[in-house]
UniProtKB/Swiss-Prot annotation:
CDD domains per UniProt: DEP_RGS7-like, RGS_FLBA
UniProt comment concerning the protein's domains: The fungal-differentiation regulator (Fungal-DR) domain is only found in fungal regulator of G-protein signaling (RGS) proteins that regulate differentiation pathways. It is required for function.
Protein's recorded name: Regulator of G-protein signaling 1
Induction: By nitrogen starvation and pheromone.
Species this protein is from: Schizosaccharomyces pombe (strain 972 / ATCC 24843)
Region (Disordered), start-end ranges: 1-31
SMART domains documented for this protein: DEP, RGS
Length: 481
């Protein structure tokens, strides 16, 4: 596989990828009606992950992916780069929030418009390509477009993102259509937990351990042809330093294979993030450079650079005798047995590796609306708390739109991802939402809905601790609680 190079830095205009405007269709004179903001940009020049994935999904569902001719055959579900650029020139996403009030039902329509110049649009599409959400038909590993007429398809990761976006917004039939286009027998894309304020990845040594098991598998397989969904591992024998007549077997991997696996099979969104995560595998001594003269703690995917599994890495994978292959059970059993169900769940949600396994379990069993509600309220809590402390009027209006979105998605009578709440709490939230366009000042209304959403989050956490957690522990042989 050819060596890959970091893409050139995005042009200064890239930060203008966004006139991100929200307008409400009610009470044209109300200050809730309109707000605009620049998308937050990471230090690597990429919009924060939530905006980035929403923008990608909106672009995809607004573009006609159809049957296109390529050389002497046809490619299904494809489009050209030119089509995507045309879509991005005038892209908007409309969401309708229905709020019951004393005067009947009100409709709050939120329209998000993205104003993106063509130069920035091309740069953005290249970022989608690097994130492995898109791929070029004749060169899936490419990280730059050859020309504007090149033919593109969604990757398995791209289909997963769009399907989840549609499901979140209540378009279940469309979500199923997108979900049906990728191989469900393949492993799920590994989710990545992030700090909402910085978009930085939540990670520790256990997160690295989980990724190592996902990359290489708990079953000892050597050679590239065994399992194409794992990083290829090659067996290399060399003379033992202690006895020249005996040989030592090492397990070799190439940096480019590790890099491609991380970008294609996890929700990492740029190659600098991938380098940081992969470097942690070196820092925590799961892998080591083949050549000790290399910089020991800096991961590289340059051509020819390879790594060996360390003894710690081999033991973590369970490739040695007398080691339990179920590392998840071992991690769950590290939780203190005297803990309550809720304390155990809170511990799982704090540990990146256990959180990933638990969220995947919920999704697999079609009950992930509780997890998504929990995560949305966490994000709302962080954003509104900061807006309230700094008295940022634009951020407060954004918090209003966010609160309405949470209500419409999880708590309204026709919510596509309804969560189960106590009837009295549900009634309190519904009654307060009815005053959404009436209470002044806006900050006063938000403070109360903030409290109610935190109460709802606690109720959902209790629900997961009493039901989903027990099933998760039972399935994985965890604590018998």
């Amino acid at each position: 596989m050819p060596a890959l190079h970091n893409p050139s830095s995005p042009p200064p205009s890239y930060e203008a990828v966004t006139s991100y405007r929200n307008g409400n269709s009610i009470d044209s004179g109300d200050k809730r009606q309109q707000c605009s903001r620049l998308m937050k940009i990471t230090s690597n020049g990429r919009p924060y992950s939530k905006d980035f994935l929403e923008l990608f999904s909106t672009m995809v569902i607004s573009t006609n992916f159809s049957r296109n001719r390529y050389r002497f055959s046809y490619v299904e579900n494809s489009c050209t780069l030119l089509q995507l650029l045309s879509t991005l020139e005038n892209l908007q996403l409309s969401q309708v929030n229905r709020i019951k009030s004393r005067c009947g039902s009100k409709v709050l329509k939120s329209t998000t418009k993205f104003t993106i110049p063509k130069t920035a649009a091309k740069c953005l599409c290249n970022t989608f390509l690097n994130a492995r959400l898109l791929q070029i038909v004749n060169n899936p590993s490419a990280r730059k477009f050859s020309n504007e007429k090149c033919l593109l398809q969604l990757t398995r990761k791209g289909y997963s993102v769009v399907s989840e976006f549609l499901q979140h917004n209540g378009h279940n039939s469309q979500a199923e259509l997108y979900a049906s286009k990728w191989n469900h027998s393949a492993p799920v894309i590994v989710s990545i937990s992030r700090f909402s304020s910085t978009d930085q990845i939540l990670k520790d040594s256990s997160f690295c351990e989980m990724l190592l098991v996902r990359m290489l598998g708990s079953v000892h397989e050597i050679g590239k042809s065994k399992n194409p969904l794992l990083v290829p591992v090659y067996s290399v024998s060399s003379p033992s330093p202690k006895d020249s007549l005996s040989k030592v077997t090492k397990y070799q991997m190439f940096g480019i294979d590790i890099a491609e696996w991380l970008m294609c099979n996890t929700m990492l969104l740029d190659w600098s993030e991938m380098e940081t995560v992969a470097s942690d595998l070196l820092i925590h001594s799961y892998i080591a450079y083949e050549n000790n003269s290399e910089t020991p703690l800096k991961f590289s995917y340059a051509k020819g650079v390879s790594y060996f599994l360390t003894g710690k890495g081999i033991a973590t994978l369970g490739w040695t005798k007398n080691v339990s292959n179920n590392k998840l059970i071992n991690k769950i059993n590290e939780v203190e047995k005297g803990s309550t169900n809720k304390e155990i769940l809170e511990t799982i949600l704090r540990k990146p590796n256990l959180q990933t396994y638990f969220f995947e379990f919920l999704k697999k069993n079609f009950c992930d609306e509780n997890q998504r509600f929990y995560s949305e309220v966490c994000e709302f809590n962080d954003y509104f708390s900061h807006a309230n402390e700094t008295n940022d009027h634009e951020a407060i209006r954004e918090s209003f739109a966010h609160a309405c979105g949470i209500y419409n998605c999880f708590l309204s009578s026709n919510a596509p991802n309804a969560v189960n709440l106590p009837s009295d709490l549900y009634e309190k939230i519904t009654n307060h939402m009815a005053l959404a366009m009436e209470v002044e000042p806006l900050n006063e209304w938000l403070q109360l809905i903030h409290i109610l959403l935190l109460e709802a989050q606690t109720a959902v956490l209790d629900l997961m601790a009493g039901d989903s957690l027990l099933k998760f522990l039972e399935l994985n042989g965890g604590l018998g609680i």
